[in-house]
Amino acid sequence: MSSKVHLGHTARKRFGQNFLTDDNVINRIVGAIAPDNDHVMVEIGPGLGALTEPVATAIDNLTVVELDRDLVERLQNHPVLKDKLTIHQGDALQFDFSQLVVPGKKLKVFGNLPYNISTPLMFHLFEFAEQIETMHFMLQKEVVLRLSASPGNKAYGRLTVMAQYFCQVVPVLEVPPHSFAPPPKVDSAVVRLLPYAEKPFPCKDVNVLRQLCTTAFNMRRKTLRNNLKQVLSDEEFEQLGIDPNLRPEQISVEQYVAMANMVCDKQA
């Protein structure tokens, strides 16, 4: 049997499918997720149910978002899970997670995410951060390093700034390739994202911050002065106390927010 076949399902490359099979890792992830009935529990990409089963067993209802129709059908016919699940067949990148919110209950979102969509999916989920209590995701280890990086680290970038603007980022555990079927070609890691109830550095317009980060990191080897010359002058950098000769990865989240707020003030 092909190594891409697991429990009778052939992993689809276009969906980035790698199924978690290591019980020890599964138990540790479920422990980190801490499923309960006080939140709306949401799984993205339940796949063959490695996390779905233990989480659903611990609670009354689990909402899942799954793109693969074959896997949706398996879940709909699952002898144990079918009565516990609310299934949304569709693309998580297009999904409106705010529709899942129940009065008095925030979301706890988790999943073993397809690595080919993990970064755009993070940006999509940040839009719903105010409705989310916690997020726990299995990701490519490199993405977890980017999410949790500090200024001056080569992994520090646009994703870092936006993630740490919205959330506290906590790496949970590393997961080797042999914990999956088929084994991915990269190391994986689980990360915990805790959206801030009150952001440490509030931005007047998050879209301005997003655009500023995109512009700043477009040419990582260039200085801020070079990359942001269309939006901020040397005098404005001086007002902010930011050295325009620094590179984009040397600037803190707080400083990016300060720059974005100055741009907002100029546009007002």
From Swiss-Prot:
GO terms for cellular component: cytosol. Its EC number is 2.1.1.182. Keywords: Cytoplasm, Methyltransferase, RNA-binding, rRNA processing, S-adenosyl-L-methionine, Transferase. It catalyses: adenosine(1518)/adenosine(1519) in 16S rRNA + 4 S-adenosyl-L-methionine = N(6)-dimethyladenosine(1518)/N(6)-dimethyladenosine(1519) in 16S rRNA + 4 S-adenosyl-L-homocysteine + 4 H(+). The keyword Cytoplasm applies. It is an enzyme of class 2 (transferase). Transmembrane segments: none annotated. It is found in: Cytoplasm. S-adenosyl-L-methionine binds at N18, L20, G45, E66, D91, N112. It holds the Pfam family RrnaAD. Specifically dimethylates two adjacent adenosines (A1518 and A1519) in the loop of a conserved hairpin near the 3'-end of 16S rRNA in the 30S particle. May play a critical role in biogenesis of 30S subunits. Belongs to the class I-like SAM-binding methyltransferase superfamily. rRNA adenine N(6)-methyltransferase family. RsmA subfamily. This is Ribosomal RNA small subunit methyltransferase A. It comes from Shewanella sp. (strain MR-7). The gene is rsmA.
